[in-house]
Design a protein with these regions (language model features):
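Intrinsic disorder/low-complexity segments
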Residues: 223-224
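Phosphate-bearing ligand-interacting subdomains
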Residues: 36-95
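Short amphipathic alpha-helical segments
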Residues: 18-20, 74-78, 119-120, 190-191, ...
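Basic polycationic patches enriched in arginine
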Residues: 227-230
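Hydrophobic, well-ordered beta-alpha structural blocks that scaffold small-molecule cofactor pockets
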Residues: 1-42, 48-56, 105
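Structural signal for interior beta-strand "rungs" in well-ordered beta-sheet cores
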Residues: 87-203
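Short phosphate-engaging motifs
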Residues: 13, 71, 185
Length: 233
């Protein structure tokens, strides 16, 4: 039976998730998003209202299409008693032996999830990413485009693995980390923070202060806000 899905997040990422849903033979009901400046449609898909309107659509399934793990987790906590949709692109290769993918997770085109891998809830396994055998991926992790995790890697909650990054086998990365684009992780990471380079090393983040609102913008992450004396990454 085909499923009908409401997407939280009307953005480029949301459009990719919508495409996965359609290619899986399911129906996209529309988007919910708190941005008041959105048009009534995005790529021909209706914008139904704000996130708070979700109660009108409780007969349908939901998926959160937002890249920021902190926001994704906050929204998941706001949506009570909904059914979560797990979006897996038809071209993704998912091993049939001892593999588990949590609810609300998105697995994009040409990604590979191998035998024995466990992926938590509301994760993003992006285009062409490789999650090798016996990986343990906790909730809200984002494995970016083309990133590769070798066998028996564990990744803690809400860690972001940047585009093209590589993680050697039998390693552990704690939660709350940002692994920069192209970084190569060759040893365990036990302290949350931003890690860049080959081999990946922790980098102290510079802060640029916005004079208008006295807020901070993390120079390392650019788009991610600086909150409570530390980078939100």
């Amino acid at each position: 039976m085909n499923k009908s899905v409401v997407i939280i997040g009307a953005s480029g990422h949301g459009k990719v998730v919508a495409d996965i849903i359609k290619k899986s033979g399911d129906e996209v009901v529309g988007f919910l998003d708190d941005n008041p400046h959105l048009p009534k449609e995005l790529s021909g898909i209706p914008v139904l209202g704000t996130v708070g309107d979700y109660t009108k659509y409780k007969d349908f399934m939901f998926v959160v299409a937002i890249g920021n793990a902190e926001i994704r987790e906050k929204i998941v906590g706001q949506l009570n008693c909904v059914k979560w949709y797990t979006a897996i692109h038809p071209s993704a290769v998912i091993a049939s032996i001892d593999t588990n993918i949590g609810e609300g997770t998105v697995v994009m085109a040409n990604a590979v999830v191998n035998a024995g891998a466990r992926i938590g809830k509301h994760c993003i396994i992006n285009t062409g990413a490789v999650v090798e055998h016996d990986n343990q991926i906790e909730d809200y992790v984002h494995v970016s485009v083309g990133a590769k995790l070798a066998g028996t890697v564990s990744v803690g909650k809400a860690t972001w693995i940047g585009i093209g990054a590589s993680v050697s086998n039998n390693l552990s990365i704690c939660g709350g980390c940002m692994i920069g684009a192209g970084a190569v992780v060759v040893k365990n990471i036990s302290e949350a923070g931003t890690y860049v380079g080959v081999p990946a090393e922790r980098r102290l983040v510079m802060i640029s202060i916005n004079e208008k609102n006295q807020g901070g913008v993390c120079v390392e992450c650019n788009a991610m806000p600086f909150r409570n004396g530390r980078c939100a990454a």
